[in-house]
């Protein structure tokens, strides 16, 4: 409140009441960073409709399915049941540029071009448009989904011509198509009519009454791997996580206090490798076996697990790493209540940087424990370096080597 228009309130909670509350607070502050009349349009999914479609396919109410640019068999918590249900549909067709879990269970697969071979247009936020144009000709005998729709609807236009006609009639208002195509973007200056929330009707009691679980699982996407669409790219697999410095894997991050309580640990081997315990995590009746990284600074009572791993379709065997965290993504909520128990097995990590003793570094840094420091002679924990003279070892402080 003191910050006034310079203030901004944000929330990462997947809850409608929390989002409405933040919306109301920023409106009340008249925050300069809050622009409700030009919202970002990058995420327009409807969870209720997606859940309804998934349940309809599994129950048999829906008889046919066409997918484009999505892989629900991999990216939903009911993916395994959904995959079996898709096999039993009367008709299923997957438009995709690469084989994935959904396509593997579909009756028909239609090859689509890569996005660098395709035309497209986007509205990133209200009134701000962009054009995508191919950088190369199609390498294979593929066809864009939009061109297929145009043919099925009886249109003789190509998708490029359809985009051009739509922009000229509804967006450009007489401006030059060639100029916009050259620039790649266009801002119309229009904005949405934003209705100020009724603060008196926002019921915040669910937030106040919400109880915190004993252990919360935070599902997240890694900087390099994302949701796993590019898991067949070895450069992204090799890219180490900026925090844990681990590559080629996902894992359960946990605080030191919780790790000690659960009997989980990380160990360093003599050659500088990092090993870790396995844990069994259970949420909503589903269990996964996951290796553990003890992460300094993590909040007690929370564990983290990244999306994007565990893919088995469309990848070479040596790149089929990690486990699929989407199986715990119940109702598309990134925070889940979980139970954790330690397993006896140990996992070998590909970690590019450890955060404690580095073996084989010689005398760059002297170190010892407090007990040895207090009970042993100095020569035990901090010996004077020696040099060789006439094949005889002398301390570097000896007059013999001057």
Regions found by a protein language model. Give the residues of each.
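Short acidic (Asp/Glu) and glycine-rich catalytic loops that position anionic groups and cofactors
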Residues: 2-5, 31-36, 62, 125-134, ...
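Stable alpha-helical elements in mature extracytoplasmic
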Residues: 18-21, 82, 145-148
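Active-site phosphate/pyrophosphate-binding segments
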Residues: 1-58, 169-173, 177
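Active-site phosphate/pyrophosphate- and oxyanion-stabilizing loops and adjacent acidic/basic residues
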Residues: 23, 27, 80, 100, ...
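Non-catalytic, well-ordered alpha-helical segments in soluble enzyme domains
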Residues: 144-168
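A broad structural signal for alpha-helix termini and local helix breaks/kinks
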Residues: 29, 153-156, 262-263
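A cross-kingdom feature strongest in bacterial/archaeal respiratory oxidoreductases
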Residues: 38-44, 51-139, 167-402
């Amino acid at each position: 409140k003191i910050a006034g228009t310079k203030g901004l309130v944000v929330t990462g909670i997947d809850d409608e009441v929390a989002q409405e509350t933040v919306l109301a607070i920023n409106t009340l502050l008249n925050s300069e960073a809050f622009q409700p009349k030009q919202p970002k349009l990058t995420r327009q999914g409807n969870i209720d409709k997606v859940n309804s479609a998934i349940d309809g396919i599994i129950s048999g109410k829906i008889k046919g399915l066409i997918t484009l640019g999505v892989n629900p068999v991999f990216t939903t918590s009911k993916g395994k049941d959904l995959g079996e249900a898709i096999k039993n549909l009367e008709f299923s067709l997957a438009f995709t540029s690469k084989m994935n879990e959904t396509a593997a269970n579909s009756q028909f697969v239609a090859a689509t071009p890569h996005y660098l071979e395709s035309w497209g247009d986007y509205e990133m936020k209200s009134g701000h448009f962009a054009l995508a144009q191919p950088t190369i000709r199609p390498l294979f005998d593929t066809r864009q989904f939009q061109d297929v729709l145009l043919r099925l609807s009886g249109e003789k236009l190509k998708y490029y011509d359809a985009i051009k006609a739509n922009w000229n009639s509804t967006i450009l208002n007489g401006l030059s198509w060639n100029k916009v195509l050259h620039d790649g973007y266009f801002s119309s200056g229009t904005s949405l009519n934003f209705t100020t929330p009724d603060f008196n009707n926002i019921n915040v009691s669910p937030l106040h009454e919400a109880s915190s679980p004993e252990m919360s699982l935070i599902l997240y996407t890694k900087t390099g791997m994302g949701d796993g669409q590019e898991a067949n790219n070895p450069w992204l697999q090799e890219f180490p996580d900026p925090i844990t410095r681990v590559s080629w894997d996902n894992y359960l991050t946990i605080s030191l206090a919780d790790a000690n309580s659960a009997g989980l640990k990380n160990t360093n081997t003599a050659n500088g490798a990092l090993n870790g315990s396995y844990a069994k995590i259970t949420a909503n009746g589903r269990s996964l076996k996951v290796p553990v990284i003890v992460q300094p600074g993590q909040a007690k009572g929370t564990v983290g697990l990244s999306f994007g791993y565990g893919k088995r379709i469309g990848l070479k065997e040596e790149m089929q790493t990690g486990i699929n965290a989407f199986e715990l993504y119940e109702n598309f909520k990134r925070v889940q209540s979980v139970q954790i128990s330690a397993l006896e097995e140990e996992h070998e990590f590909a970690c590019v940087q450890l955060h404690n003793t580095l073996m084989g570094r010689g005398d760059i840094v002297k170190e010892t424990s407090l007990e040895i420091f207090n009970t042993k002679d100095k020569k035990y924990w901090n010996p004077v370096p020696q040099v060789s003279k006439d094949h005889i070892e002398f301390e570097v402080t000896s007059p013999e080597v001057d």
